[in-house]
Regions:
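Intrinsically disordered, acidic/Ser/Pro-rich low-complexity regions proximal to membranes
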Residues: 1, 14-17
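Alpha-helical linker/edge segments of TPR/alpha-solenoid repeat scaffolds
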Residues: 46-62, 86, 115-127, 133-140, ...
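"A position-specific structural signal for the A-helix of alpha-solenoid helical repeats
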Residues: 8-9, 42, 75, 104-112
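Start-of-helix register in tetratricopeptide repeats
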Residues: 5, 38, 71, 104-105
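Alpha-helical adaptor scaffolds
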Residues: 25-98
Length: 145
Protein backbone atom coordinates (compact mmCIF):
# COMPACT_ATOMS: atom_id res chain seq x y z
CA UNK A 1 0.00 0.00 0.00
CA UNK A 2 1.17 3.52 -0.81
CA UNK A 3 -0.92 5.01 1.98
CA UNK A 4 1.27 5.33 5.08
CA UNK A 5 -1.28 4.26 7.74
CA UNK A 6 -2.34 1.27 5.64
CA UNK A 7 1.27 0.16 5.14
CA UNK A 8 2.05 0.52 8.86
CA UNK A 9 -1.03 -1.49 9.87
CA UNK A 10 -0.37 -4.13 7.20
CA UNK A 11 3.21 -4.41 8.41
CA UNK A 12 2.13 -4.88 12.02
CA UNK A 13 -0.50 -7.47 11.13
CA UNK A 14 1.85 -9.47 8.92
CA UNK A 15 4.61 -9.33 11.54
CA UNK A 16 2.21 -10.55 14.24
CA UNK A 17 1.41 -13.53 12.00
CA UNK A 18 5.09 -14.34 11.60
CA UNK A 19 5.34 -13.00 8.05
CA UNK A 20 8.23 -10.68 8.86
CA UNK A 21 9.77 -10.66 5.39
CA UNK A 22 6.49 -9.69 3.75
CA UNK A 23 5.90 -7.00 6.39
CA UNK A 24 9.40 -5.61 5.84
CA UNK A 25 8.92 -5.49 2.07
CA UNK A 26 5.67 -3.50 2.35
CA UNK A 27 7.17 -1.05 4.83
CA UNK A 28 10.37 -0.62 2.81
CA UNK A 29 8.44 0.07 -0.38
CA UNK A 30 6.29 2.70 1.32
CA UNK A 31 9.28 4.21 3.17
CA UNK A 32 11.10 4.66 -0.15
CA UNK A 33 8.21 6.84 -1.33
CA UNK A 34 7.35 8.62 1.90
CA UNK A 35 9.28 8.04 5.16
CA UNK A 36 7.13 8.31 8.29
CA UNK A 37 7.65 7.60 12.04
CA UNK A 38 4.79 5.06 12.09
CA UNK A 39 6.53 3.05 9.39
CA UNK A 40 9.81 3.15 11.32
CA UNK A 41 8.09 1.90 14.48
CA UNK A 42 6.35 -0.93 12.64
CA UNK A 43 9.64 -1.91 10.99
CA UNK A 44 11.69 -1.74 14.19
CA UNK A 45 9.31 -3.97 16.12
CA UNK A 46 8.46 -6.40 13.31
CA UNK A 47 10.40 -9.20 15.00
CA UNK A 48 9.41 -10.00 18.56
CA UNK A 49 12.32 -10.52 20.90
CA UNK A 50 14.87 -8.43 19.01
CA UNK A 51 17.43 -6.67 21.16
CA UNK A 52 17.85 -2.91 20.95
CA UNK A 53 20.95 -3.49 18.80
CA UNK A 54 18.97 -5.75 16.45
CA UNK A 55 16.36 -2.99 16.09
CA UNK A 56 19.13 -0.46 15.47
CA UNK A 57 20.51 -2.62 12.65
CA UNK A 58 17.03 -2.97 11.13
CA UNK A 59 16.33 0.76 11.30
CA UNK A 60 19.73 1.55 9.80
CA UNK A 61 18.78 -0.59 6.78
CA UNK A 62 15.48 1.27 6.49
CA UNK A 63 17.11 4.69 6.90
CA UNK A 64 19.60 3.96 4.13
CA UNK A 65 16.71 3.66 1.67
CA UNK A 66 16.21 7.45 2.03
CA UNK A 67 19.45 8.63 3.67
CA UNK A 68 18.91 12.37 3.18
CA UNK A 69 15.42 12.47 4.66
CA UNK A 70 14.98 13.86 8.17
CA UNK A 71 12.68 10.94 9.03
CA UNK A 72 15.52 8.51 8.31
CA UNK A 73 17.86 10.44 10.57
CA UNK A 74 15.30 10.68 13.36
CA UNK A 75 14.39 6.98 13.19
CA UNK A 76 18.04 5.94 13.15
CA UNK A 77 18.90 8.27 16.03
CA UNK A 78 15.97 7.10 18.13
CA UNK A 79 16.94 3.46 17.68
CA UNK A 80 20.57 4.34 18.49
CA UNK A 81 19.52 6.11 21.69
CA UNK A 82 17.53 3.05 22.75
CA UNK A 83 20.64 0.92 22.08
CA UNK A 84 22.80 3.43 24.00
CA UNK A 85 24.87 4.10 20.89
CA UNK A 86 25.03 7.85 21.35
CA UNK A 87 27.79 8.52 18.81
CA UNK A 88 25.66 6.77 16.17
CA UNK A 89 22.65 8.85 17.22
CA UNK A 90 24.61 12.09 16.90
CA UNK A 91 25.94 11.00 13.50
CA UNK A 92 22.41 10.25 12.28
CA UNK A 93 21.16 13.71 13.28
CA UNK A 94 24.21 15.76 12.29
CA UNK A 95 23.10 16.53 8.69
CA UNK A 96 19.84 18.04 9.95
CA UNK A 97 21.05 20.19 12.84
CA UNK A 98 22.21 23.23 10.87
CA UNK A 99 19.98 23.19 7.82
CA UNK A 100 16.82 21.20 8.62
CA UNK A 101 16.43 21.42 12.39
CA UNK A 102 12.96 20.27 13.39
CA UNK A 103 11.43 20.07 16.83
CA UNK A 104 11.88 16.30 16.97
CA UNK A 105 15.55 16.49 15.95
CA UNK A 106 16.19 19.02 18.74
CA UNK A 107 14.29 16.86 21.26
CA UNK A 108 16.34 13.83 20.22
CA UNK A 109 19.53 15.83 20.76
CA UNK A 110 18.26 16.74 24.24
CA UNK A 111 17.69 13.03 24.96
CA UNK A 112 21.24 12.27 23.85
CA UNK A 113 22.72 14.96 26.12
CA UNK A 114 20.80 13.64 29.13
CA UNK A 115 21.36 9.96 28.49
CA UNK A 116 25.00 10.11 27.45
CA UNK A 117 26.41 12.86 29.64
CA UNK A 118 23.63 13.61 32.13
CA UNK A 119 24.06 17.23 31.03
CA UNK A 120 20.80 18.93 31.96
CA UNK A 121 22.12 22.33 30.83
CA UNK A 122 22.84 21.18 27.26
CA UNK A 123 19.54 19.28 27.22
CA UNK A 124 17.71 22.50 28.18
CA UNK A 125 19.51 24.35 25.39
CA UNK A 126 18.26 21.76 22.90
CA UNK A 127 14.73 21.96 24.30
CA UNK A 128 14.86 25.75 23.90
CA UNK A 129 15.93 25.28 20.29
CA UNK A 130 13.09 22.78 19.86
CA UNK A 131 10.57 25.44 20.88
CA UNK A 132 11.56 27.65 17.95
CA UNK A 133 12.55 24.99 15.40
CA UNK A 134 10.48 24.09 12.37
CA UNK A 135 7.47 21.90 12.96
CA UNK A 136 7.89 18.26 12.07
CA UNK A 137 6.08 17.15 8.94
CA UNK A 138 2.79 15.41 9.67
CA UNK A 139 0.49 13.23 7.62
CA UNK A 140 -2.97 14.71 7.28
CA UNK A 141 -6.01 13.80 5.27
CA UNK A 142 -7.41 16.37 2.87
CA UNK A 143 -10.96 17.55 3.19
CA UNK A 144 -13.39 17.82 6.03
CA UNK A 145 -15.41 15.28 7.94
Amino acid sequence: PALIPAAAVAGRILASRGQTAKAAKIIQRTWSQSPHPDLAAAYAYARIGDSTHDRLDRIKQLALLKPHDVESGAAWASAAIDAREYAVARHALQPFIKTKLTRRVARLMARIELAEKNDAGRAREWMTRAATAAFDPVWTADGTA
